[in-house]
Regions:
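Active-site-proximal, substrate-binding regions of enzyme catalytic domains
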Residues: 1-80, 84-86, 93, 104, ...
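A short alpha->loop->secondary-structure connector
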Residues: 101-107
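Mid-chain, well-packed structural core segment of small domains
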Residues: 96-97, 118
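Long, charge-dense
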Residues: 109-122
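Residue-level detector of family-conserved "landmark" positions at structurally sensitive sites
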Residues: 91, 109, 126-127
């Protein structure tokens, strides 16, 4: 999900909402490699690193056998969200499906923008601009978001 915001130049947008954002320390250090500047910016904006407990790690291993399309980092995210009662933010469809099966609330990039608009944090015009930027990012292969959902939100 963070890559979507990075690709359209709005890495700060989720932090305008009154939420706390966490990522497992392992995922952040090992897999989350868009750029060092992206990592630095996310930490400055307030992204927090979560240390995985032994129980969460064991649950992640269990999830790997149950949800074979998920990486270890995906199962860590699912395990942490489930154990701590957190909402999972992801655009990864297999992870979203596993979260739903596990009773974990899950949302993604488009939901974040819907929240920004609904809460009056961004204007209708800003929302329209961002939706257009996301559509363009999908067209150019920079983001993987459901085009139909984006076009539903686009003004005619």
């Amino acid at each position: 999900m963070w890559i979507d915001f990075y690709e359209i130049g709005h890495i700060d947008h989720p932090f305008r909402l009154d939420f706390e954002y966490f990522i497992s320390r392992d995922t952040f250090q090992d897999e989350f490699i868009k750029s060092e500047s992206m990592k630095t910016n996310l930490l400055k904006l307030g992204l927090q690193l979560a240390d995985v407990t032994d129980d969460e790690f064991m649950q992640a291993i269990s999830f790997q056998s149950r949800y074979t399309k998920l990486s270890l980092y995906d199962t860590l995210a699912l395990s942490i969200a489930k154990a701590r009662g957190w909402t999972l933010l992801t655009g990864d469809m297999p992870l979203r499906m596993a979260a739903a099966k596990e009773g974990v609330e899950v949302h993604g990039t488009i939901w974040v923008y819907d929240q920004l608009k609904t809460q009056g944090i961004i204007t209708d015009d800003e929302y329209e601009t961002v939706i257009g930027e996301l559509i363009e990012a999908v067209k150019t292969g920079k983001c993987r978001l459901p085009k139909a959902e984006l076009f539903k939100r686009k003004r005619v």
